[in-house]
Amino acid sequence: MAKKSLIQREKKRQKLEQKYHLIRQSLKKKIRSKVSPLSLSEKTKIREQLQSLPRNSAPTRLHRRCFLTGRPRANYRDFGLSGHVLREMVYECLLPGATRSSW
């Protein structure tokens, strides 16, 4: 199981990303807009505003974790579980529709 502090840190990042998502998106849209081209100085001002946002509010800082164990690796997006937890739950028939493979 992952350390509690790492799980809490990831939750904090998710909250920050949700809080600043619209602001970040609008600033990026302004920079990329081809309808009204911006001068170089205007673009740098917008970039400075982007850089002034908290680092942890960037979506690239987020990492998927297993919601049961908090494990950061080998996660299946469909279930939100890590591989070994998924395997155990399938063996115990706790996931409807998921079956063990046999050939």
Curated annotation (Swiss-Prot):
Any one GO BP annotation for this protein: translation
Against Gene3D superfamilies, the record matches this protein to: 1.10.287.1480
**Record keyword rRNA-binding present:** yes
Q: Give the top-rank taxon of the lineage listed in the UniProt record for this protein.
A: Eukaryota
Among PROSITE patterns, the record links this protein to: RIBOSOMAL_S14
Q: Which GO terms describe its cellular component?
A: chloroplast; small ribosomal subunit
The set of disulfide-linked cysteines is none
What are the coiled-coil residue ranges?
Answer: none
Pfam family of this protein, just one?
Ribosomal_S14
Entry keywords, A to Z = Chloroplast, Plastid, Ribonucleoprotein, Ribosomal protein, RNA-binding, rRNA-binding
Query: Where's it found, cell-wise?
Result: Plastid, Chloroplast
Q: Where are the transmembrane segments?
A: none
Q: Which GO terms describe its molecular function?
A: rRNA binding; structural constituent of ribosome
Quaternary structure (record):
Part of the 30S ribosomal subunit.
PANTHER family in alphabetical order: 30S RIBOSOMAL PROTEIN S14, SMALL RIBOSOMAL SUBUNIT PROTEIN US14M
The cross-references to HAMAP family, in alphabetical order and at most eight, read: Ribosomal_uS14_1 (MF_00537)
Task performed by this protein: Binds 16S rRNA, required for the assembly of 30S particles.
Which family does the similarity line name? Answer: Belongs to the universal ribosomal protein uS14 family.
This chain belongs to the protein called Small ribosomal subunit protein uS14c
**Gene source species:** Agrostis stolonifera (Creeping bentgrass)
The top of its lineage is: Eukaryota, Viridiplantae, Streptophyta, Embryophyta, Tracheophyta
